[in-house]
């Protein structure tokens, strides 16, 4: 390689920041600029603005933050034009990624970069098998390459001419071979409370978690891992709780999973981590009522938890929308606490192990190797 290639990398949430850092670590011979969080910045990335500005989820929530997102889109387009990277690598945050690329294609300077070889790669294939299958065609028009988590996703995109590479689920990079699975019997009754990494979801779930915690019989320890974007809010919120949970850094969450008897968790990335670590859990999610209604209309799958979808059965009980309340959580908590139910759930979670990762190679390294081969 004669010249050091430049990658403009964009991560919009914590899981993307972790994967982005793993990719950067595996590509020391490339220069990285862009948008990231604490993990990527620890490796030298100077984020052009706080990653938390992109951590918005839900149709209504995105509309509420439309002005800020528009400003960040324009800022990112300008930065890409000014820095002239060889590759734009986007990790999740598909709405933002597609808006940036669309803006570049409409900008004369952006079109000039594209004509000179600028490529667009995206990590995380949208779940077109679950809802809005038309997105596959749109992705094919937007990106030059797509990295999917699972083999079965590939045909949905290659039929439209989009080169798609299955790489396994990146969360497995931080779990497989590093942490032992949960044992089916726990002496210390530790319950992990996982309200999510986006402020919008945290604000909706924390009051529900408080009511749940205060209704659980004595004898349990509650622990909440926090990320930098939500830590201050969560610490302030729990000050008024009658039962005080322990607050730990998100960096310590895998050790928490090893010890946890059970978890109550927001739908999303954390539910995948819990499943990989064989932690019995109850999945909850409380979004804006209109977002929930639209989701019920558009989604074509019975469950939101990936482990439930992959195994085509309800392993993790799900409480979504108005069902996500303290009373229902407590009912499920009591049910899953039963020794037989608890052991059966762990056994079911172990059945998904082979689906998360095709081999022993790290996902971040696999993506890095593929990119290096292209350049």
Model-predicted regions and their roles:
Residues 1-375:
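Nucleotide-activated sugar donor-binding and catalytic core shared by glycosyltransferases
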């Amino acid at each position: 390689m004669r010249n050091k290639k430049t990658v403009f990398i964009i991560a919009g949430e914590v899981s993307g920041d972790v994967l982005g850092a793993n990719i950067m670590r595996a590509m020391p011979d490339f220069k990285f600029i862009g948008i990231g969080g604490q993990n990527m910045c620890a490796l030298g990335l100077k984020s052009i603005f706080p990653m938390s500005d992109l951590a918005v989820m839900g149709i209504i929530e995105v509309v509420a933050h439309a002005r800020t997102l528009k400003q960040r889109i324009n800022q990112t387009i300008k930065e890409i034009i000014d820095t002239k990277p060889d590759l734009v690598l986007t990790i999740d945050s598909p709405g933002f990624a597609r808006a940036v690329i669309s803006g570049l294609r409409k900008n004369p300077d952006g079109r000039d970069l594209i004509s000179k070889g600028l490529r667009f790669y995206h990590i995380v294939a949208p779940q077109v098998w679950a809802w809005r299958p038309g997105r596959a065609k749109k992705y094919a028009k937007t990106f030059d390459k797509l990295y999917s988590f699972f083999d079965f996703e590939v045909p949905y995109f290659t039929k439209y001419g989009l080169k798609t590479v299955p790489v396994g689920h990146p969360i497995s990079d931080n779990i497989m071979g590093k942490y032992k699975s949960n044992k089916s019997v726990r002496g210390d009754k530790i319950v992990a409370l996982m309200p999510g990494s986006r402020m919008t979801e945290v604000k909706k779930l924390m009051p529900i978690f408080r009511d749940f915690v205060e209704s659980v019989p004595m004898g349990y320890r509650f622990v909440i891992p926090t990320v930098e974007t939500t830590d201050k809010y969560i610490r302030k919120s729990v000050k008024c709780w009658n039962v005080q949970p322990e607050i730990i850094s998100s960096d310590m969450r895998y050790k928490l999973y090893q010890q946890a008897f059970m978890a109550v968790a927001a739908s999303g990335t954390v539910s995948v981590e819990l499943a990989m670590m064989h932690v019995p859990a109850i999945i909850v999610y409380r979004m804006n009522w209109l977002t929930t209604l639209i989701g019920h209309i558009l989604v074509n799958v019975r469950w939101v938890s990936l482990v439930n979808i992959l195994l085509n059965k309800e392993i993790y009980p799900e409480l979504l929308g108005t069902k996500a309340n303290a009373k229902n959580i407590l009912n499920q908590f009591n049910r899953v606490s039963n020794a037989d139910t608890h052991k059966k759930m762990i056994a079911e979670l172990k059945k998904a192990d082979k689906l998360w990762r095709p081999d022993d190679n790290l996902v971040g390294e696999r993506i890095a190797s593929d990119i290096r081969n292209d350049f």
